[in-house]
Design a protein with these regions (language model features):
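Intrinsically disordered, low-complexity, mixed-charge
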Residues: 1-178, 182, 189
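Internal gly/pro-rich beta-alpha loop/helix module
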Residues: 62, 165, 323, 327-402, ...
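A phosphate-binding glycine/aspartate-rich beta-alpha loop in the early core of alpha/beta enzymes
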Residues: 76, 159, 221-286
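A contiguous, well-structured pocket-lining segment that forms one wall/lid of small-molecule binding clefts
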Residues: 178, 185-187, 413-451, 563-720, ...
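Short glycine-rich phosphate-binding loop at a beta-alpha junction
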Residues: 215, 457-469, 718-729
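Conserved phosphate-binding catalytic cores of ATP/NTP-utilizing and phosphoryl-transfer enzymes
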Residues: 259-264, 317, 343-348, 374-375, ...
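Conserved phosphate-binding/catalytic loops in two-lobed NTP-binding clefts
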Residues: 466, 481-493, 721-724, 733, ...
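Glycine-rich phosphate-binding/hydrolytic loop that grips phosphoryl groups
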Residues: 491-512, 516-518, 557-566, 701, ...
Length: 779
């Protein structure tokens, strides 16, 4: 007879871990106990040596589906120390300090789906059905350990039948904290109306069927929903939400419905129908003009559509119910918020912000503690490439194997905000918060930071934030009453890529995005940095240009285009002639802009790669203005991709005009990538009538060549052979592939993002990593 004390670390709460341990104990024929300690699960296993060994093998090889075991510690203990165990028991949770791992929310499992649509089951059509394998976790959690009384389900006492299942080791709901049924669980209802339960769901389905718009409360917040096959309904939602062109996310009935509209490979299907169920950006199928399905206005001008499957029971009931209403196979399911505001999470917010955008509000009385917008995932070379990391993924920690000790908070960026809490080598990125230009989002950030600090039981020693003095994220960090460390935006991008790839040594960082406050007070965004966790050096950039017109220039790429053309010609008349030839803007608009350039009025020096893409899109006549962030740049990418599909070889630009053979030098002697010469070439070829798609492709290829050549020259100086690619521009998969392949041909080792976004949704990780190193160095 032996006794072992076992501690299991990882995602072991809210995933049915203790019931699974109990079943393994029974199968192996051992006695003992299992207790949730908060940071870990503690097990005592007592029995014959072969039985205990069998139990440990089962524990390691057959964990619950949703668990993530990071490590298992075992030690022998004496029987007299803990006594003899007569059976195997699940002991009430105890609170213990240590490493903490919180489970994200888990999509409805197959077993619960079957029960929900079984007329003989007592949870038939129950909108909140769940078990140990699925259901809300992070979004209902007040504190750890994960038990019902520390969740928003504490307001719903279990009925005798649910309590019986909860206490029975033989059931799937043994120790399932959110367990409930139609008799004792939360209830759906229409706000401001009498319909509740069944009547509310039927009214919602009828409204959507008839072309209406409904706000629907899910797991992490509200969605705005309408029939995605109804052009009139989608256009009305666009008008109400003031969203003329930005793609809407779609929820499909099932995998087969997705395959009707999109090309889906095995990897994508597995993720699409997995337990996280993010929005996947999938390529649209080519369809005939008279085919039915998704209407064009869902994702206009985009070769892809963002699509997901139902992950909450109430969402499944929208598609299938016993009321005889035939619902479409596709629903628009876009975030329930007004422009710039965070996703609504309660009735008060929904009524105030969404009432004018919808015909009904379907809510429920289970409180959402933490907002969690949908995650968005693209694919690159067959692998996941995260665009927005939120529901289903947050707050799973990123592990970095640096010998760091301490606790830090990073406030993240101003746009696409997420924050990050670092504890030693573990970094917990929050769900998506949003754009902090809106004070409601700032408030949401502050609330979520406080809740995460409580949940993870941390007291940060340092707050990290962006270098920009006027960012609201900077203000939030400064108001925490902690020492503040400010990190340059693009340096944080590169550190986030290093941390995700667990790179400890120096890299050449290629940080390409829309904007970031530089150490010299100008706008950066097309940078080559030499970086490690101690600091960075700006080694190069794209050619600086005047960004005229302030914030509006980010939406009107033609302004940057005029500035770039003028920078090349240095002649007003010649510039106006070119602008007229390519129909870039009116003559009066051009004159005003040139005058502003001469006087440096409302103009700032910039090396923004994002604005460069916008300008090229305008020059080529693809998009002169953007109605949403990245619209012009995306259109340029799509045009280049369309050309690549048609033609495999292109003509080289004449006389090497766009080549990077002669880099310019700024006063500080940094390498300058000759993007100005590339603009000159593209403008000339456009006036000659060369196909815009071809020129878009040439732009991508030549920019990739400039980046590769710049990295090669930096390597010659520094001997650094690792390159990290980060920043929102690298969501452009064509540029990413061209740069990566170009660097690999030069025998560089290339680091890129995978499950941490390359955009500003990932920079909090880089900020936190720097702050952790800052603590180690005792700065």
């Amino acid at each position: 007879m032996i006794t072992k004390k076992i501690r299991v670390y990882g995602i072991v709460q809210g995933v049915g871990f203790r019931p699974t341990v109990s079943r393994h104990a029974a199968a192996a024929g051992i006695t003992g106990s299992v207790c949730n300690k908060g940071p870990y699960v503690e097990i005592f296993a007592q029995g014959e040596e072969k039985c205990v060994k069998d139990f440990l093998e089962r524990l390691e090889n057959q964990p619950p589906k949703r668990a993530a075991i990071l490590k298992i510690n075992t030690e022998d203990v004496k029987e007299e120390e803990y006594g003899k165990f007569n059976d195997f028991q699940i002991i009430e949770s105890e609170k213990t300090k240590g490493e903490i791992f919180v489970s994200p929310d888990i999509a409805i499992c197959e077993e619960c789906k079957k029960e929900m649509y079984d007329p003989k089951d007592r949870r038939y059509l129950h909108p909140f059905i769940n078990c140990t394998c699925c259901g809300p976790r992070l979004t209902i959690l007040d504190a750890l350990p994960y038990d019902r009384e520390r969740t928003s389900m504490k307001e719903f006492p279990m009925c005798p039948d649910c309590a019986s299942e909860y206490e029975d080791p033989a059931t799937r709901r043994y120790d399932a904290q959110p367990v409930c049924c139609n008799d004792c669980g939360p209830e759906v209802y229409l706000t401001g109306r009498e319909e509740r339960g069944r009547a509310a769901i039927i009214a919602t389905r009828k409204m959507i069927h008839d072309g209406g718009i409904v706000a629907i409360k899910g797991i992490g917040g509200f969605h705005l929903c309408c029939d995605a096959t109804n052009e009139e309904a989608v256009q009305r939602l666009r008008t109400l939400k003031n969203r003329p062109a930005k793609p809407f996310a779609v929820m499909a009935r099932d995998v087969e419905a997705v395959k009707q509209e999109c090309l889906v490979n095995e990897v994508q299907e597995e993720i699409l129908d997995g337990h996280q169920k993010p929005i996947l950006l999938l390529e649209k199928r080519k369809k005939s003009a008279d085919s039915t399905g998704l209407c064009k206005s869902v994702a206009p001008g985009n070769p892809k559509v963002g699509i997901m499957l139902p992950y909450a029971p109430v969402q499944m009931l929208l598609f299938q119910y016993d009321d005889g209403i035939e619902m479409p196979d596709y629903l628009v399911m876009t975030s329930g918020n007004t422009s710039g505001a965070p996703i609504c999470r309660d009735d008060k917010e929904a009524v105030e912000e969404l009432s004018q955008l919808c015909d009904l509000i379907l809510s429920h009385d289970r409180k959402i503690r933490i907002r969690a917008d949908d995650s968005v995932m693209d694919f690159y070379k067959g692998e996941p490439y995260m665009i927005r990391r939120s529901r289903g993924y947050a707050p799973l920690p990123m592990m970095v194997t640096m010998p760091w000790k301490g606790q830090v908070l990073a406030a993240g960026g101003e746009l696409k905000n997420t924050f990050c809490i670092g504890v030693d080598g573990r970094f917990y990125l929050s769900p998506y918060v949003g754009d902090l230009e809106d004070l409601r989002t700032v408030k949401a950030l502050q609330e979520t930071i406080h809740r995460f600090e409580t949940l993870l039981e941390v007291e940060p020693e340092v707050a990290a934030c962006d270098l920009h003095p006027k960012y609201n994220s900077t203000v939030v960090a400064e108001e925490l009453g902690l020492p503040v460390v400010k990190i340059q935006h693009h340096y944080a991008h590169i550190l986030s890529c290093m941390a995700e790839n667990d790179r400890k040594e120096q890299v050449i960082g290629v940080a390409f995005d829309g904007t970031g406050y530089g150490t010299d007070g100008t706008i950066w965004g097309g940078e080559l940095l030499l970086a490690d966790y101690h600091g960075f050096e700006r080694m190069g950039s794209i050619e600086p240009f005047l960004q005229i017109g302030g914030d509006i220039s980010a939406k009107e790429g033609w302004r940057i285009a005029v500035s770039l053309i003028y920078q090349q010609t240095q002649d007003k008349e010649q510039t106006m002639e070119i602008v007229k030839k390519i129909n870039l803007c009116s003559e009066p608009e051009c004159k005003v802009l040139l005058a502003m350039a001469d006087r440096k009025m409302n103009a700032v020096l910039s090396t923004s790669a994002g604005r460069l893409f916008d300008a090229v899109s305008a020059i080529l006549g693809i998009r002169t203005k953007s109605t949403f962030e990245g619209e012009a740049s995306m259109a340029l990418e799509f045009a280049a991709e369309a050309y690549e599909k048609e033609i495999w070889e292109i003509d080289e630009p004449a006389d090497g005009e766009s080549g990077p053979d002669e880099e310019k030098k700024e006063p500080e002697d940094r390498l300058i990538m000759k993007t100005g010469s590339l603009i000159k070439y593209l403008t000339e070829k456009k006036t000659e009538g060369i196909q815009a798609e071809k020129l878009a492709y040439i732009f991508h290829q030549k920019l990739a060549d400039l980046i590769t050549d710049g990295c090669r020259k930096i390597r010659k100086k520094t001997k650094c052979n690792y390159v990290a690619l980060s920043g929102g521009v690298f969501q452009n998969r064509l540029l990413l592939r061209m740069v990566e392949e170009g660097l690999e041909k030069e025998h560089f080792t290339v680091l890129r993002h995978h499950l941490i976004p390359a955009n500003d949704g990932g920079i909090a990780l880089g900020q936190a990593a720097y702050a952790m190193q800052y603590i180690q160095e005792g700065k």
